[in-house]
Amino acid sequence: MTVETFNPKQTTTLETPAKTLEAASADSTATGNRIGFVSLGCPKNLVDSERILTQLRIDGYEVTNSYDNADLVIVNTCGFIDAAVEESLDAVREALEENGKVIVTGCLGAKENQIREVHPDVLEITGPHSYEAVLKHVHKYVPKPEHNPFTSLIPQTGVKLTPKHYAYLKISEGCDNRCTFCIIPALRGDLDSRPAGSVLDEAKRLVESGVQEILVVSQDTSAYGKDKGGRTDFWNGMPVKQDITSLARQLGKMGAWVRLHYIYPYPWVDDLIPLMAEGLILPYLDIPMQHASPRILKMMKRPGRVDRQLEAIQRWREICPDLVIRSTFIVGFPGETEEDFEMLLDFLREARLDRVGCFKYSEVEGAVANTIAELISEDVKEDRYHRFMEVQAEISAERLARFVGRTMDILIDDVDEEGAIGRSFADAPEIDGMVFINGETELEPGMLVRAVITHSDEHDLWAELVDADAEDDIEA
């Protein structure tokens, strides 16, 4: 079976410009004016793209996967790190060269001058989650077509750019933290949580449409509701507390997998673990820890008590032994010494995290960290990155090996001529490993099957389907 290349640097980030164009076009039945669309960046940006595309479809526009026959192209950009900025500017350049009429939105759009310096011919620029402004600009350059809404019905979940069996659910915008390496608050503002009733309504529609996995995302998921001042919302006529634990509990009752991403290590994360142990939500935490040196964490303006982190991890695993922890770290942060880096390696060895991504520090325009201490050379960053990944590869292999011989639920993502490719509760789409079931070509994406794990490496699992009758006999 063909094994896709795993990128250990990748975190919860989705880069799918081609997929965006094709997926939106495939669902399009409108016959109005044509809009091209490119979506870059993280799942939060993907959700923004879905919302814009949904409104375009409602207004009667057709979304096309070709620049040539588009009346206008929208590029939803990312501006988090320099590589993302470069990719976004390249995408804008390509759209201008191939089409000529381009509207830019997204995180990089918050830096209009930076875009205009490189691409002065862009029609309009808006910042992130500026849905109404984007549509207003589209109407200006490509008037709304006359159309019969009954001939271009939109699914109740809106346009989705993910496979039909999973979807991202964004629960808030912005962030109140001020990590020195990050400029997201400057781009997307402070925390702004959606009303709980609105979130749960959307989740219910997703499940009713056939979604089997809900991936909860935001800039700071565990902070959900902090800005609500303890106010209660209502859903289905019942009061719902607006905090992440209460929201997760309600989501867990809907009958789909619920996976939490972007969890900041607040003390109340402890309250989520019993929900995982009960099976209400998946025993999976995406919790970026960034470093383990107290000195570096202080410079990052991140929680600095590593001993408490280790105690929390031990406590969580005692409550929920199946818990899978994914994290990301930065090596080569300004001022990082060899001693700081060794502390990070020691933390990895002690914490035994399941999935880990690593980034070499990259200067982000406007980030405080750029001038906080002496910058680390590229050679040193590269060396530390490889040493980091070498240590973690052994740990990840050990953690995955515990699943061998175990029967697990596998959600099928894809099927090719060699068999099926799926994921277990331990694997988020796009960023984690996969489960390969060789020879099972009759399965279909979206199926949830039982399989026994036969083999593992540092990234992936291999499995064989379990005969349902045989499993019933064993359980009896």
Swiss-Prot record:
Pfam families: Radical_SAM (PF04055), TRAM_2 (PF18693), UPF0004 (PF00919). It is an enzyme of class 2 (transferase). GO terms for molecular function: 4 iron, 4 sulfur cluster binding; aspartic acid methylthiotransferase activity; metal ion binding; protein methylthiotransferase activity. It is found in: Cytoplasm. InterPro entries: Elp3/MiaA/NifB-like_rSAM (IPR006638), Methylthiotransferase (IPR005839), Methylthiotransferase_CS (IPR020612), Methylthiotransferase_N (IPR013848), Methylthiotransferase_N_sf (IPR038135), NA-bd_OB-fold (IPR012340), Ribosomal_uS12_MeSTrfase_RimO (IPR005840), rSAM (IPR007197). One of its GO terms (cellular component) is cytosol. Its main location: cytoplasm. It catalyses: L-aspartate(89)-[ribosomal protein uS12]-hydrogen + (sulfur carrier)-SH + AH2 + 2 S-adenosyl-L-methionine = 3-methylsulfanyl-L-aspartate(89)-[ribosomal protein uS12]-hydrogen + (sulfur carrier)-H + 5'-deoxyadenosine + L-methionine + A + S-adenosyl-L-homocysteine + 2 H(+). Its EC number is 2.8.4.4. Residues 401-467 form the TRAM domain. Signal peptide: none annotated. Binds 2 [4Fe-4S] clusters. One cluster is coordinated with 3 cysteines and an exchangeable S-adenosyl-L-methionine. Residues 33-143 form the MTTase N-terminal domain. This is Ribosomal protein uS12 methylthiotransferase RimO. It comes from Shewanella sp. (strain MR-4).
